[in-house]
């Protein structure tokens, strides 16, 4: 696995402290994309410690809002995410991780959590 730290611990904490953890459980939303294709693979949550671990190890870490703990993506499945880019949005309450996905991103075994077609159709009323 070719994970490379994206920041020193000091830089990582500076970045983590600059974010706005206003979402569930004191987290930022993390949108995960394939670095080559831009495909959205999953959405997760990160607390400050998950941000620091991600930046200092180069492997995606998340905060489980249900289990109330940090987890390393791939810790049980081996389906790691090697982080190549870490971006913050203008409000500091969301981040984008551009990753090399090892195996499936979704717990169902699918490459992406967004691979199922929508179960409903939306019709636009062009006359309105």
UniProtKB/Swiss-Prot annotation:
One of its GO terms (molecular function) is phosphoribosyl-AMP cyclohydrolase activity. Keywords: Amino-acid biosynthesis, Cytoplasm, Histidine biosynthesis, Hydrolase, Magnesium, Metal-binding, Zinc. It is found in: Cytoplasm. GO terms for biological process: L-histidine biosynthetic process. It is an enzyme of class 3 (hydrolase). Belongs to the PRA-CH family. This is Phosphoribosyl-AMP cyclohydrolase. It comes from Pyrobaculum calidifontis (strain DSM 21063 / JCM 11548 / VA1). The gene is hisI.
């Amino acid at each position: 696995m070719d994970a490379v730290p994206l920041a020193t611990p000091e830089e990582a904490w500076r970045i983590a402290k600059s974010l706005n953890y206003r979402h569930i459980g004191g987290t930022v939303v993390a949108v995960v994309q394939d670095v080559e294709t831009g495909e959205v693979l999953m959405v997760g949550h990160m607390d400050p410690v998950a941000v620091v671990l991600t930046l200092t190890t180069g492997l995606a870490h998340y905060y489980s809002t249900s289990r109330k703990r940090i987890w390393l993506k791939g810790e049980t499945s081996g389906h790691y995410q090697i982080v190549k880019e870490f971006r913050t949005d203008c409000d500091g309450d969301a981040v984008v991780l551009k990753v090399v996905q090892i195996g499936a991103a979704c717990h169902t075994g699918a490459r992406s959590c967004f691979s199922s077609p929508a179960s409903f159709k939306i019709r636009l009323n062009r006359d309105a």
